[in-house]
């Protein structure tokens, strides 16, 4: 793994998301060695993933190289790897590139998509937590529109142009708005044979209102 031995306390951080990055920034003035593990070598600004999915932004606009973020941080080391196991008694992490001892461990691996027990949503939908997932969604959206552009069967055409978003939280609302903006401002320019009214965007929420985590006022 090629991490230098040190007499300083070694802190291993698993996850280069908001929590992991914020923790490391707060520790930059401390006399410690920090080793960050993440499966990607970039930090993703997740609030803007929907703009990548809707083709409003390119991935490099929301992906920041982790090595660059901490380039001036002394005692910082990054390893792109998956951490498979933690032995808390032996104070050791086991990763896809080897094992490493630690003095302190920070687990900042983020969250997983919650399907709330809905098996159909889990089976047929595409989650949007990472840049690759956002690009997959973008690719499918544009592919469907291309298929609709050459489809003569109206029923099949309608299937290609119907988009369903599960979840009325901030990301779902923003994604629905981005697709609506695409339909209004871009669709007729790039696809003149598809009318705005043909493209449907459905936002599905299990609760009684959208943005339920936010104040009504």
Regions found by a protein language model. Name each.
Residues 2-77, 84, 163-164, 170-214:
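Beta1-alpha1 glycine-rich phosphate/pyrophosphate-binding loop at the start
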């Amino acid at each position: 793994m090629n991490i230098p031995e040190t007499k300083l306390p070694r802190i291993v951080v698993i996850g280069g998301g908001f929590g992991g990055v914020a923790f490391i920034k707060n520790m930059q003035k401390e006399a410690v060695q920090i080793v960050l593990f993440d499966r990607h070598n970039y930090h993703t600004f997740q609030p803007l993933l929907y703009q990548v999915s809707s083709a409003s932004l390119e991935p490099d606009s929301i992906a920041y190289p982790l090595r660059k973020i901490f380039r001036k941080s002394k005692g910082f080391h990054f390893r792109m790897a998956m951490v498979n196991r933690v032995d808390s008694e032996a104070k050791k992490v086991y990763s896809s590139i080897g094992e490493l001892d630690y003095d302190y461990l920070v687990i900042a691996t983020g969250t997983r998509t919650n399907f709330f027990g809905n098996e159909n949503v889990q089976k047929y939908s595409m989650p949007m937590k990472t840049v690759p997932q956002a690009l997959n969604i973008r690719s499918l959206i544009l592919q469907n529109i291309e298929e609709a552009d050459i489809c003569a069967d109206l029923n099949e055409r309608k299937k290609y142009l119907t988009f369903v978003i599960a979840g009325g939280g901030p990301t779902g609302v923003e994604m629905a708005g981005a697709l609506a903006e695409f339909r209004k401002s871009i669709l007729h320019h790039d696809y003149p044979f598809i009318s705005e009214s043909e493209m449907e965007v459905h936002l599905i929420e299990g609760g009684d209102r959208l943005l339920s985590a936010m104040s009504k006022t």
